[in-house]
Swiss-Prot record:
One of its GO terms (molecular function) is acetylcholine-gated monoatomic cation-selective channel activity. Glycans are attached at N161. This is Acetylcholine receptor subunit alpha. Residues 21-230 are extracellular. The chain crosses the membrane at residues 231-255, 263-281, 297-316, 429-447. GO terms for cellular component: acetylcholine-gated channel complex; cell surface; membrane; neuromuscular junction; neuron projection; plasma membrane; postsynaptic specialization membrane; synapse. It comes from the Eukaryota. One of the alpha chains that assemble within the acetylcholine receptor, a pentamer of two alpha chains, a beta, a delta, and a gamma (in immature muscle) or epsilon (in mature muscle) chains. The muscle heteropentamer composed of alpha-1, beta-1, delta, epsilon subunits interacts with the alpha-conotoxin ImII. The lineage of its organism: Eukaryota, Metazoa, Chordata, Craniata, Vertebrata. GO terms for biological process: acetylcholine receptor signaling pathway; membrane depolarization; monoatomic cation transport; monoatomic ion transmembrane transport; muscle cell cellular homeostasis; musculoskeletal movement; neuromuscular junction development; neuromuscular process. The keyword Kinase does not apply. It comes from Rattus norvegicus (Rat). It is a multi-pass membrane protein. Upon acetylcholine binding, the AChR responds by an extensive change in conformation that affects all subunits and leads to opening of an ion-conducting channel across the plasma membrane. Pfam families: Neur_chan_LBD, Neur_chan_memb.
Length: 457
Protein backbone atom coordinates (compact mmCIF):
# COMPACT_ATOMS: atom_id res chain seq x y z
CA UNK A 1 0.00 0.00 0.00
CA UNK A 2 2.79 2.40 0.95
CA UNK A 3 4.66 1.52 -2.25
CA UNK A 4 1.58 2.41 -4.28
CA UNK A 5 1.31 5.81 -2.56
CA UNK A 6 4.97 6.60 -3.27
CA UNK A 7 4.62 5.66 -6.93
CA UNK A 8 1.49 7.78 -7.21
CA UNK A 9 3.27 10.78 -5.68
CA UNK A 10 6.21 10.42 -8.06
CA UNK A 11 3.82 10.19 -10.97
CA UNK A 12 2.05 13.41 -9.98
CA UNK A 13 5.39 15.25 -9.63
CA UNK A 14 6.51 14.03 -13.03
CA UNK A 15 3.23 15.09 -14.56
CA UNK A 16 3.58 18.57 -13.01
CA UNK A 17 7.10 18.91 -14.37
CA UNK A 18 6.02 17.83 -17.83
CA UNK A 19 3.10 20.24 -17.78
CA UNK A 20 5.37 23.07 -16.58
CA UNK A 21 7.91 22.35 -19.30
CA UNK A 22 5.11 22.18 -21.84
CA UNK A 23 3.82 25.60 -20.80
CA UNK A 24 7.29 27.16 -21.06
CA UNK A 25 7.87 25.46 -24.40
CA UNK A 26 4.63 26.86 -25.82
CA UNK A 27 5.43 30.27 -24.35
CA UNK A 28 8.93 30.44 -25.82
CA UNK A 29 7.66 29.23 -29.20
CA UNK A 30 4.95 31.89 -29.21
CA UNK A 31 7.28 34.73 -28.07
CA UNK A 32 9.99 34.08 -30.64
CA UNK A 33 7.78 33.05 -33.57
CA UNK A 34 8.17 36.36 -35.42
CA UNK A 35 10.75 37.96 -33.12
CA UNK A 36 13.81 39.79 -34.51
CA UNK A 37 16.79 40.46 -32.26
CA UNK A 38 18.00 43.35 -34.44
CA UNK A 39 14.88 45.51 -34.05
CA UNK A 40 14.50 47.86 -31.12
CA UNK A 41 11.74 46.61 -28.77
CA UNK A 42 9.31 49.54 -29.11
CA UNK A 43 5.74 49.88 -30.40
CA UNK A 44 6.54 53.12 -32.22
CA UNK A 45 9.89 53.91 -33.84
CA UNK A 46 9.80 57.35 -32.22
CA UNK A 47 9.83 55.85 -28.74
CA UNK A 48 13.05 55.70 -26.74
CA UNK A 49 14.18 52.47 -25.13
CA UNK A 50 14.94 53.18 -21.49
CA UNK A 51 17.86 51.08 -20.26
CA UNK A 52 18.86 51.08 -16.60
CA UNK A 53 22.52 50.24 -15.99
CA UNK A 54 24.04 49.24 -12.67
CA UNK A 55 27.64 48.28 -11.95
CA UNK A 56 28.51 45.73 -9.30
CA UNK A 57 32.20 45.65 -8.43
CA UNK A 58 33.33 42.19 -7.36
CA UNK A 59 37.13 42.36 -7.24
CA UNK A 60 40.01 44.69 -7.97
CA UNK A 61 42.34 42.27 -9.70
CA UNK A 62 45.36 44.36 -10.65
CA UNK A 63 46.63 47.92 -11.00
CA UNK A 64 49.37 48.14 -13.64
CA UNK A 65 51.19 51.42 -12.95
CA UNK A 66 53.52 51.06 -15.94
CA UNK A 67 50.85 50.46 -18.60
CA UNK A 68 48.22 52.43 -16.64
CA UNK A 69 45.64 49.64 -16.75
CA UNK A 70 43.22 48.70 -13.97
CA UNK A 71 41.80 45.18 -14.17
CA UNK A 72 38.49 44.57 -12.38
CA UNK A 73 35.95 41.80 -12.05
CA UNK A 74 32.46 43.28 -12.42
CA UNK A 75 28.85 42.40 -13.08
CA UNK A 76 27.05 44.79 -15.40
CA UNK A 77 23.36 44.81 -14.58
CA UNK A 78 21.13 45.99 -17.45
CA UNK A 79 17.35 46.30 -17.34
CA UNK A 80 14.84 47.31 -20.02
CA UNK A 81 11.35 46.47 -21.26
CA UNK A 82 10.87 44.54 -24.49
CA UNK A 83 7.50 45.41 -26.03
CA UNK A 84 7.43 42.17 -28.01
CA UNK A 85 8.01 39.79 -25.08
CA UNK A 86 4.85 40.13 -23.03
CA UNK A 87 2.28 37.44 -22.18
CA UNK A 88 -0.63 36.59 -19.94
CA UNK A 89 0.49 34.15 -17.23
CA UNK A 90 -3.01 32.60 -17.08
CA UNK A 91 -2.63 31.38 -20.65
CA UNK A 92 0.55 29.46 -19.80
CA UNK A 93 -0.17 27.72 -16.54
CA UNK A 94 0.73 30.72 -14.37
CA UNK A 95 4.29 31.03 -15.72
CA UNK A 96 5.46 34.54 -14.85
CA UNK A 97 9.23 34.35 -15.38
CA UNK A 98 11.48 32.46 -17.72
CA UNK A 99 15.22 32.34 -18.41
CA UNK A 100 16.26 32.62 -22.03
CA UNK A 101 19.64 32.93 -23.81
CA UNK A 102 20.68 36.55 -24.17
CA UNK A 103 21.77 36.10 -27.79
CA UNK A 104 18.14 35.38 -28.80
CA UNK A 105 16.86 38.87 -27.88
CA UNK A 106 17.67 42.49 -28.64
CA UNK A 107 20.32 43.90 -26.31
CA UNK A 108 21.71 47.39 -25.84
CA UNK A 109 25.31 47.34 -27.07
CA UNK A 110 26.78 48.76 -23.87
CA UNK A 111 30.58 48.86 -23.99
CA UNK A 112 33.43 50.18 -21.88
CA UNK A 113 34.63 53.31 -23.65
CA UNK A 114 37.97 53.65 -21.83
CA UNK A 115 38.82 50.03 -22.48
CA UNK A 116 42.53 49.19 -22.62
CA UNK A 117 42.11 45.69 -24.02
CA UNK A 118 41.08 44.29 -27.38
CA UNK A 119 37.45 43.52 -26.54
CA UNK A 120 35.25 46.54 -25.93
CA UNK A 121 31.96 44.65 -25.83
CA UNK A 122 30.73 42.15 -23.27
CA UNK A 123 31.31 38.76 -24.83
CA UNK A 124 29.94 36.56 -22.03
CA UNK A 125 26.39 35.81 -23.17
CA UNK A 126 24.60 34.58 -20.06
CA UNK A 127 20.88 34.02 -19.80
CA UNK A 128 18.47 36.85 -19.10
CA UNK A 129 15.52 36.91 -16.71
CA UNK A 130 12.28 37.77 -18.52
CA UNK A 131 8.93 38.33 -16.78
CA UNK A 132 5.44 38.51 -18.25
CA UNK A 133 5.48 42.34 -18.39
CA UNK A 134 8.37 42.23 -20.85
CA UNK A 135 10.83 43.44 -18.21
CA UNK A 136 14.29 42.01 -18.86
CA UNK A 137 17.16 41.77 -16.38
CA UNK A 138 20.58 40.82 -17.73
CA UNK A 139 23.59 40.68 -15.42
CA UNK A 140 26.58 39.33 -17.35
CA UNK A 141 29.96 39.00 -15.60
CA UNK A 142 32.91 40.71 -17.20
CA UNK A 143 36.62 41.35 -16.73
CA UNK A 144 37.21 45.01 -17.48
CA UNK A 145 40.65 46.35 -18.32
CA UNK A 146 40.15 50.08 -18.16
CA UNK A 147 42.64 52.83 -18.83
CA UNK A 148 43.49 54.92 -15.77
CA UNK A 149 46.03 57.69 -15.48
CA UNK A 150 48.24 56.49 -12.64
CA UNK A 151 50.00 59.31 -10.78
CA UNK A 152 52.93 57.80 -8.85
CA UNK A 153 54.21 61.03 -7.29
CA UNK A 154 53.24 59.95 -3.77
CA UNK A 155 53.91 56.21 -4.18
CA UNK A 156 53.51 54.20 -1.92
CA UNK A 157 51.28 56.66 -0.02
CA UNK A 158 49.25 57.45 -3.12
CA UNK A 159 45.62 57.70 -4.08
CA UNK A 160 44.34 57.02 -7.57
CA UNK A 161 41.18 58.33 -9.19
CA UNK A 162 40.10 55.85 -11.85
CA UNK A 163 36.92 55.67 -13.88
CA UNK A 164 34.83 53.36 -16.05
CA UNK A 165 32.89 55.01 -18.86
CA UNK A 166 29.93 52.92 -20.04
CA UNK A 167 27.65 53.70 -22.96
CA UNK A 168 26.01 52.30 -26.07
CA UNK A 169 28.31 52.05 -29.07
CA UNK A 170 25.86 52.65 -31.93
CA UNK A 171 22.69 54.09 -30.39
CA UNK A 172 22.43 57.79 -29.60
CA UNK A 173 20.27 59.30 -26.90
CA UNK A 174 17.30 59.80 -29.24
CA UNK A 175 16.69 56.05 -29.61
CA UNK A 176 18.25 54.45 -26.50
CA UNK A 177 18.57 56.26 -23.19
CA UNK A 178 20.75 54.75 -20.49
CA UNK A 179 20.17 55.69 -16.86
CA UNK A 180 22.19 54.78 -13.77
CA UNK A 181 20.49 52.42 -11.35
CA UNK A 182 22.13 54.32 -8.49
CA UNK A 183 24.52 57.20 -8.00
CA UNK A 184 27.19 54.75 -6.87
CA UNK A 185 28.26 51.23 -7.82
CA UNK A 186 27.21 48.22 -5.80
CA UNK A 187 30.02 47.19 -3.43
CA UNK A 188 28.02 44.72 -1.35
CA UNK A 189 29.90 41.72 -2.77
CA UNK A 190 33.27 43.41 -3.17
CA UNK A 191 36.24 41.28 -2.11
CA UNK A 192 38.82 43.40 -0.32
CA UNK A 193 42.21 43.74 -1.95
CA UNK A 194 45.46 43.29 -0.06
CA UNK A 195 46.97 46.38 -1.65
CA UNK A 196 44.10 48.79 -2.30
CA UNK A 197 41.07 50.10 -0.45
CA UNK A 198 38.23 51.95 -2.17
CA UNK A 199 37.56 55.17 -0.29
CA UNK A 200 34.84 56.55 -2.53
CA UNK A 201 32.82 55.46 -5.56
CA UNK A 202 30.35 57.58 -7.51
CA UNK A 203 28.47 57.42 -10.80
CA UNK A 204 27.34 60.25 -13.10
CA UNK A 205 25.31 60.41 -16.27
CA UNK A 206 26.68 62.57 -19.08
CA UNK A 207 25.21 64.05 -22.23
CA UNK A 208 27.93 64.40 -24.85
CA UNK A 209 27.55 66.27 -28.15
CA UNK A 210 30.14 65.54 -30.82
CA UNK A 211 31.14 67.91 -33.62
CA UNK A 212 29.80 65.52 -36.26
CA UNK A 213 26.26 65.75 -34.94
CA UNK A 214 25.85 68.72 -32.58
CA UNK A 215 22.09 68.21 -32.15
CA UNK A 216 22.25 64.54 -31.18
CA UNK A 217 23.13 63.64 -27.58
CA UNK A 218 25.21 60.58 -26.79
CA UNK A 219 24.72 59.29 -23.28
CA UNK A 220 27.20 57.59 -21.02
CA UNK A 221 27.47 56.63 -17.37
CA UNK A 222 30.86 57.19 -15.79
CA UNK A 223 31.78 55.57 -12.48
CA UNK A 224 34.66 57.14 -10.55
CA UNK A 225 36.65 55.19 -7.96
CA UNK A 226 39.02 56.79 -5.44
CA UNK A 227 41.47 54.08 -4.42
CA UNK A 228 44.07 54.39 -1.68
CA UNK A 229 47.10 52.11 -1.59
CA UNK A 230 47.86 50.16 1.58
CA UNK A 231 51.56 50.97 2.15
CA UNK A 232 52.45 48.39 4.83
CA UNK A 233 54.18 46.04 2.38
CA UNK A 234 56.44 48.79 1.06
CA UNK A 235 57.14 50.19 4.54
CA UNK A 236 58.35 46.82 5.80
CA UNK A 237 60.23 45.70 2.69
CA UNK A 238 61.65 48.96 1.34
CA UNK A 239 61.49 51.98 3.64
CA UNK A 240 62.62 50.35 6.90
CA UNK A 241 65.61 48.54 5.28
CA UNK A 242 66.73 51.81 3.64
CA UNK A 243 66.42 53.56 7.01
CA UNK A 244 68.54 50.85 8.65
CA UNK A 245 71.17 51.22 5.92
CA UNK A 246 71.31 54.95 6.67
CA UNK A 247 71.80 54.40 10.41
CA UNK A 248 74.43 51.74 9.72
CA UNK A 249 76.23 54.26 7.52
CA UNK A 250 76.27 56.76 10.39
CA UNK A 251 77.92 54.21 12.67
CA UNK A 252 80.99 54.26 10.42
CA UNK A 253 82.04 57.43 12.25
CA UNK A 254 81.75 55.70 15.62
CA UNK A 255 84.38 53.15 14.58
CA UNK A 256 87.92 54.16 15.67
CA UNK A 257 90.17 55.10 12.77
CA UNK A 258 93.06 53.10 14.21
CA UNK A 259 91.05 49.89 13.72
CA UNK A 260 91.51 50.17 9.95
CA UNK A 261 87.97 48.92 9.27
CA UNK A 262 86.25 52.21 8.43
CA UNK A 263 86.51 51.83 4.66
CA UNK A 264 85.68 48.12 4.88
CA UNK A 265 82.42 48.87 6.66
CA UNK A 266 81.56 51.75 4.31
CA UNK A 267 82.13 49.72 1.14
CA UNK A 268 80.23 46.76 2.61
CA UNK A 269 77.21 48.98 3.32
CA UNK A 270 77.36 50.40 -0.22
CA UNK A 271 77.52 46.95 -1.81
CA UNK A 272 74.68 45.67 0.38
CA UNK A 273 72.54 48.67 -0.53
CA UNK A 274 73.26 48.18 -4.24
CA UNK A 275 72.22 44.52 -4.13
CA UNK A 276 69.12 45.44 -2.15
CA UNK A 277 68.09 48.08 -4.70
CA UNK A 278 68.55 45.60 -7.54
CA UNK A 279 66.22 43.18 -5.78
CA UNK A 280 63.43 45.67 -5.03
CA UNK A 281 63.61 47.70 -8.25
CA UNK A 282 60.71 45.67 -9.68
CA UNK A 283 58.48 46.88 -6.84
CA UNK A 284 58.85 50.49 -7.97
CA UNK A 285 56.66 51.77 -10.82
CA UNK A 286 58.96 52.15 -13.83
CA UNK A 287 57.55 55.36 -15.25
CA UNK A 288 59.17 58.64 -16.22
CA UNK A 289 56.11 60.79 -15.61
CA UNK A 290 57.20 61.53 -12.04
CA UNK A 291 59.67 60.38 -9.39
CA UNK A 292 57.76 58.56 -6.62
CA UNK A 293 58.41 59.28 -2.95
CA UNK A 294 60.01 55.90 -2.43
CA UNK A 295 62.32 56.52 -5.40
CA UNK A 296 63.39 59.84 -3.88
CA UNK A 297 64.11 58.12 -0.57
CA UNK A 298 66.16 55.39 -2.22
CA UNK A 299 68.14 58.06 -4.08
CA UNK A 300 68.65 59.93 -0.80
CA UNK A 301 69.93 56.74 0.84
CA UNK A 302 72.39 56.08 -1.99
CA UNK A 303 73.74 59.64 -1.91
CA UNK A 304 73.91 59.42 1.90
CA UNK A 305 76.07 56.28 1.78
CA UNK A 306 78.36 57.63 -0.96
CA UNK A 307 78.82 60.91 0.95
CA UNK A 308 79.82 58.95 4.06
CA UNK A 309 82.49 57.10 2.06
CA UNK A 310 83.94 60.34 0.69
CA UNK A 311 84.02 61.95 4.14
CA UNK A 312 85.50 58.80 5.67
CA UNK A 313 88.40 59.04 3.21
CA UNK A 314 88.99 62.64 4.35
CA UNK A 315 88.90 61.62 8.03
CA UNK A 316 91.38 58.77 7.47
CA UNK A 317 93.66 61.11 5.55
CA UNK A 318 93.54 63.59 8.43
CA UNK A 319 94.28 60.86 10.94
CA UNK A 320 97.49 59.79 9.18
CA UNK A 321 98.94 63.24 8.55
CA UNK A 322 102.40 64.07 9.87
CA UNK A 323 104.43 67.28 10.22
CA UNK A 324 106.69 66.16 7.39
CA UNK A 325 103.77 66.38 4.92
CA UNK A 326 101.28 68.78 6.50
CA UNK A 327 101.61 71.73 8.81
CA UNK A 328 98.51 72.27 10.92
CA UNK A 329 97.01 75.74 10.32
CA UNK A 330 96.32 77.79 13.40
CA UNK A 331 92.59 77.99 12.64
CA UNK A 332 92.38 74.17 12.56
CA UNK A 333 94.09 73.97 15.94
CA UNK A 334 91.88 76.70 17.35
CA UNK A 335 88.61 75.20 16.05
CA UNK A 336 89.13 71.44 16.45
CA UNK A 337 91.44 71.35 19.47
CA UNK A 338 90.70 74.41 21.56
CA UNK A 339 87.04 75.28 20.82
CA UNK A 340 84.84 72.37 19.68
CA UNK A 341 85.99 69.83 22.32
CA UNK A 342 85.07 72.26 25.08
CA UNK A 343 81.68 73.02 23.51
CA UNK A 344 80.83 69.36 22.94
CA UNK A 345 82.19 68.25 26.35
CA UNK A 346 84.96 66.08 24.93
CA UNK A 347 87.75 64.99 27.24
CA UNK A 348 90.62 67.08 25.95
CA UNK A 349 93.64 65.03 24.99
CA UNK A 350 96.79 65.87 26.90
CA UNK A 351 99.15 67.63 24.57
CA UNK A 352 102.80 68.66 25.08
CA UNK A 353 103.48 72.28 25.89
CA UNK A 354 104.24 74.34 22.83
CA UNK A 355 106.43 76.85 24.72
CA UNK A 356 109.81 77.26 23.18
CA UNK A 357 112.46 75.44 25.08
CA UNK A 358 115.78 76.94 25.71
CA UNK A 359 117.99 75.72 22.97
CA UNK A 360 121.20 76.49 24.83
CA UNK A 361 121.98 73.48 26.91
CA UNK A 362 125.12 74.69 28.58
CA UNK A 363 125.49 77.66 30.82
CA UNK A 364 128.52 79.73 31.32
CA UNK A 365 129.29 77.77 34.43
CA UNK A 366 129.14 73.97 34.58
CA UNK A 367 128.85 72.30 37.94
CA UNK A 368 130.53 68.94 37.75
CA UNK A 369 129.56 66.63 40.56
CA UNK A 370 130.64 63.17 41.31
CA UNK A 371 128.31 60.45 40.06
CA UNK A 372 128.02 59.16 43.58
CA UNK A 373 126.52 62.46 44.64
CA UNK A 374 129.59 63.72 46.47
CA UNK A 375 130.51 67.36 46.03
CA UNK A 376 132.79 67.87 43.07
CA UNK A 377 135.39 70.50 42.36
CA UNK A 378 134.39 74.17 42.15
CA UNK A 379 132.38 75.23 39.11
CA UNK A 380 134.37 75.82 36.00
CA UNK A 381 133.75 78.45 33.38
CA UNK A 382 132.64 77.54 29.91
CA UNK A 383 136.01 78.48 28.58
CA UNK A 384 137.80 76.38 31.14
CA UNK A 385 140.74 74.39 29.83
CA UNK A 386 138.80 71.20 30.63
CA UNK A 387 135.92 72.17 28.35
CA UNK A 388 138.32 73.09 25.60
CA UNK A 389 139.82 69.66 25.64
CA UNK A 390 139.04 67.98 22.25
CA UNK A 391 137.65 64.76 23.70
CA UNK A 392 135.38 66.55 26.17
CA UNK A 393 134.21 68.98 23.51
CA UNK A 394 133.34 66.08 21.17
CA UNK A 395 131.33 64.39 23.93
CA UNK A 396 129.42 67.60 24.62
CA UNK A 397 128.56 68.00 20.92
CA UNK A 398 127.26 64.43 20.87
CA UNK A 399 125.05 65.05 23.88
CA UNK A 400 123.76 68.23 22.27
CA UNK A 401 122.88 66.37 19.03
CA UNK A 402 121.05 63.66 20.94
CA UNK A 403 119.05 66.26 22.86
CA UNK A 404 118.04 68.12 19.71
CA UNK A 405 117.06 64.87 17.99
CA UNK A 406 114.90 63.84 20.93
CA UNK A 407 113.31 67.27 20.95
CA UNK A 408 112.54 67.04 17.21
CA UNK A 409 111.04 63.57 17.60
CA UNK A 410 108.91 64.80 20.49
CA UNK A 411 107.62 67.72 18.46
CA UNK A 412 106.87 65.40 15.54
CA UNK A 413 104.97 63.02 17.80
CA UNK A 414 103.03 65.90 19.30
CA UNK A 415 102.04 67.15 15.84
CA UNK A 416 100.93 63.66 14.76
CA UNK A 417 98.87 63.27 17.92
CA UNK A 418 97.22 66.60 17.22
CA UNK A 419 96.19 65.45 13.71
CA UNK A 420 94.80 62.25 15.21
CA UNK A 421 92.90 64.28 17.76
CA UNK A 422 91.44 66.46 14.99
CA UNK A 423 90.31 63.31 13.15
CA UNK A 424 88.69 61.99 16.33
CA UNK A 425 86.80 65.26 16.83
CA UNK A 426 85.65 65.15 13.20
CA UNK A 427 84.36 61.60 13.73
CA UNK A 428 82.30 62.65 16.74
CA UNK A 429 80.86 65.65 14.91
CA UNK A 430 80.05 63.65 11.77
CA UNK A 431 78.37 60.91 13.80
CA UNK A 432 75.88 63.41 15.18
CA UNK A 433 75.49 65.24 11.86
CA UNK A 434 74.81 62.07 9.85
CA UNK A 435 72.32 60.78 12.42
CA UNK A 436 70.52 64.11 12.25
CA UNK A 437 70.60 64.22 8.44
CA UNK A 438 69.24 60.66 8.28
CA UNK A 439 66.29 61.59 10.50
CA UNK A 440 65.60 64.94 8.83
CA UNK A 441 65.93 63.45 5.33
CA UNK A 442 63.44 60.69 6.11
CA UNK A 443 60.94 63.17 7.55
CA UNK A 444 61.45 65.57 4.64
CA UNK A 445 60.58 62.86 2.12
CA UNK A 446 57.55 61.31 3.81
CA UNK A 447 56.23 63.63 6.52
CA UNK A 448 54.42 66.03 4.18
CA UNK A 449 52.40 63.30 2.49
CA UNK A 450 51.63 61.51 5.76
CA UNK A 451 50.32 64.73 7.31
CA UNK A 452 48.17 65.33 4.23
CA UNK A 453 46.67 61.83 4.43
CA UNK A 454 46.03 62.29 8.16
CA UNK A 455 44.17 65.53 7.53
CA UNK A 456 42.06 63.84 4.86
CA UNK A 457 41.12 61.19 7.40
Amino acid sequence: MELTAVLLLLGLCSAGTVLGSEHETRLVAKLFKDYSSVVRPVGDHREIVQVTVGLQLIQLINVDEVNQIVTTNVRLKQQWVDYNLKWNPDDYGGVKKIHIPSEKIWRPDVVLYNNADGDFAIVKFTKVLLDYTGHITWTPPAIFKSYCEIIVTHFPFDEQNCSMKLGTWTYDGSVVAINPESDQPDLSNFMESGEWVIKEARGWKHWVFYSCCPNTPYLDITYHFVMQRLPLYFIVNVIIPCLLFSFLTSLVFYLPTDSGEKMTLSISVLLSLTVFLLVIVELIPSTSSAVPLIGKYMLFTMVFVIASIIITVIVINTHHRSPSTHIMPEWVRKVFIDTIPNIMFFSTMKRPSRDKQEKRIFTEDIDISDISGKPGPPPMGFHSPLIKHPEVKSAIEGVKYIAETMKSDQESNNASEEWKYVAMVMDHILLGVFMLVCLIGTLAVFAGRLIELHQQG
